Amino acid sequence: KNKSCERGTKIHAEFENSMYQNPEKELKRYGLGGKFSVKKGHYRLDTEKAVYPEFLISVKSRDGVLRVAGQIDLLIKDGNDIIIIDFKTNKKIDRKSYYNKSTKRYECLKYPLNTIQDCNLMHYTLQLSMYAYLLQQINPDLNIKMLKLIHIDHSNKVEEIEVEYMKKEVEVLLKHYKKQLLIKEELSKDTPIVY
């Protein structure tokens, strides 16, 4: 497991370094042209054309109940268009979950996402969708142009997978989680006082 983590860290670092050396070359792959600034450690999306490696994002709900944070491997901003890229270095990307022969169904995530297959492709799709949703909470004018996984398997084969923006599912998940937090808080008020 340590070797896998080290490999993933090394691949992330190599890509990040290539961004600093020649961002224009790297961005042509995504149909983008022109000069882009590379903004390492800069967390305000105030530049018209910019690349943000390892972009930290944190959003608190208006009522203060929820705080969600994450780190986007690569965020590209072209005007209001946003591209989110995440690197995965695991052995494989599973596109289907385990098929249970006795129930004749694929395993799904827990409620409220219990219609979504429980496989790493869907986990990663939800992860990138959460990032996109959080960005739109910060600035509703942002347009999510693309969510992409770049998978580098253990034989160094690279596969780019464009994933769907599951905004509705993210909203359902956050609403459910917030409700659970509020219920837990209410129940904690009923605990007896010990003298």
Q: Where are the regions that the model predicts?
A:
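Short, flexible/disordered intra-domain loops and linkers
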Residues: 95-103, 115-118
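Metal-dependent nuclease catalytic regions and adjoining charged, substrate-binding loops involved
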Residues: 108-111, 117-195
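Short, mixed charged/polar active-site loops
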Residues: 65-69, 82, 158-160
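Conserved catalytic cores of phosphodiester-cleaving nucleases, focusing on short active-site segments
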Residues: 12, 70-96, 105-110, 131
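Metal-dependent nuclease catalytic cores that hydrolyze phosphodiester bonds in DNA/RNA
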Residues: 1-69
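Short, flexible loop/turn elements at secondary-structure junctions
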Residues: 55-61, 76-78, 89-91, 151
